[in-house]
Curated annotation (Swiss-Prot):
Reactions catalysed: IMP + NH4(+) + NADP(+) = GMP + NADPH + 2 H(+)
Any Pfam family matching the protein: IMPDH
E.C. numbers: 1.7.1.7
Organism (species): Bacillus cereus (strain ATCC 10987 / NRS 248)
CDD domains, per the entry: IMPDH
Gene Ontology cellular-component annotations: cytosol; GMP reductase complex
Xref: NCBIfam families: GMP_reduct_2 (TIGR01306), PRK05458.1 (NF003966)
Family the UniProt entry places it in: Belongs to the IMPDH/GMPR family. GuaC type 2 subfamily.
Catalytic site positions: C175 (thioimidate intermediate)
GO molecular function ontology, one term from the record: oxidoreductase activity, acting on the CH-CH group of donors
Ligand binding (NADP(+)): 204-227
Lineage: Bacteria, Bacillati, Bacillota, Bacilli, Bacillales
Biological process per Gene Ontology, one example term: 'de novo' pyrimidine nucleobase biosynthetic process
PROSITE patterns (UniProt xref): IMP_DH_GMP_RED (PS00487)
Name of this protein: GMP reductase
Length: 327
């Protein structure tokens, strides 16, 4: 791999503005059969999303993916969302009972609009088999498969029938895969996204390493259709995590999906817990993201998201540590 870089190493170069106000810029994106207000999706993690937030997002035309850490609630969740005329977007793993779950959905004529196969190392036969299983029993569901970090993986999962792939191995703020295993896209997530996107024929979801709203625009520039974000969505009033007070400031807990806090045991731990400053309402953050992205589009010299895909950029080497103090 040559020319390796991450979000903080890149600056996009402005093109002549053609709008009078950024409010003329359209941030919508289509994924599958549906159109969404922003190319952004909160991470399918237990401290980021719950039923209430999923409902709010769906009602307001934002994409969401429900986590898979309360598997027994998924059927009622799908029913509930679809009965309200909202999209049902769920996560599955690859263990044996997940195969039965997919068959149960088919038997009950429940077809979630989106199913995300959510595995730390998605370039595996286990994921390929699950893609094929879902496509056989629920052919109408849009399948997102991940996570991966190489062009080979993207091609294999697409060939198996995935409708989109999710790219990112361990770049997340509460992910310590890069430290624990020596593997991953932490520190070069943006270059990995670019590498994978060049091989892709279907949409890519960039997952992890986003630290600023500008990173969303950079992800779009390097080939993402949708951007999954954890830490920036953690710590809101609505967030599921616990609120605590420290030195007169409010904080919320945020932990990784493979952390001991998630698993309830210290086994194969590749995630950590942190406390993030309380951020106020989720709605305010989503509005700010939209406005910042509208500004990005105006700097790109266009009126739509796609205009960002063709801008020039420079590499300004800063730090390989992705803005995180690892130790």
């Amino acid at each position: 791999m040559e020319n390796v870089f991450d979000y903080e190493d890149i600056q996009l170069i402005p093109a002549k503005c053609i709008v009078n106000s950024r409010s003329e810029c359209d941030t919508t994106v289509t994924l599958g059969k549906h159109k969404f207000k922003l190319p952004v999706v909160p991470a399918n993690m237990q401290t980021i999303i719950d039923e209430r937030i999923a409902t709010y997002l769906a009602e307001n035309n934002y994409f969401y993916i429900m986590h898979r850490f309360q598997p027994e609630k998924r059927i009622s969740f799908i029913r509930d969302m679809q009965s309200r005329g909202l999209i049902a977007s769920i996560s599955v793993g690859v263990k044996a009972d997940e195969y039965e779950f997919v068959q149960q959905l088919a038997a009950e004529h429940l077809t979630p609009e989106y199913i995300t196969i959510d595995i730390a190392h998605g370039h595996s036969n286990a994921v390929i088999n699950m893609i094929q299983h879902i496509k056989k029993h629920l052919p109408e569901s849009f399948v997102i498969a991940g996570n991966v970090g190489t062009p080979e993986a993207v091609r294999e999962l697409e060939n198996a029938g995935a409708d989109a792939t999710k790219v990112g191995i361990g770049p997340g703020k509460v992910c310590i895969t890069k430290i624990k295993t020596g593997f991953g896209t932490g520190g070069w997530q943006l270059a990995a996204l670019r590498w994978c996107a060049k091989a892709a024929s279907k949409p890519i979801i960039a997952d992890g390493g986003i630290r600023t709203h500008g990173d969303v625009a950079k992800s779009i520039r390097f080939g993402a259709t949708m951007v999954m974000i954890g830490s920036l969505f953690a710590g809101h009033e609505e967030s599921p995590g616990e609120t605590i007070e420290k030195d007169g400031k409010l904080y919320k807990e945020y932990f990784g999906s493979a952390s001991e806090f998630q698993k309830g045991e210290k086994k194969n731990v590749e995630g950590k817990k942190m406390f993030v400053e309380h951020k106020g309402s989720l709605e305010d953050t989503l509005i700010e993201m939209e406005q910042d992205l509208q500004s990005s589009i105006s700097y790109a010299g266009g009126t739509k998201l796609d205009s960002i895909r063709t801008v020039d950029y420079v590499v300004v080497k800063n730090s390989i540590f992705n803005g995180d103090k690892v130790y």
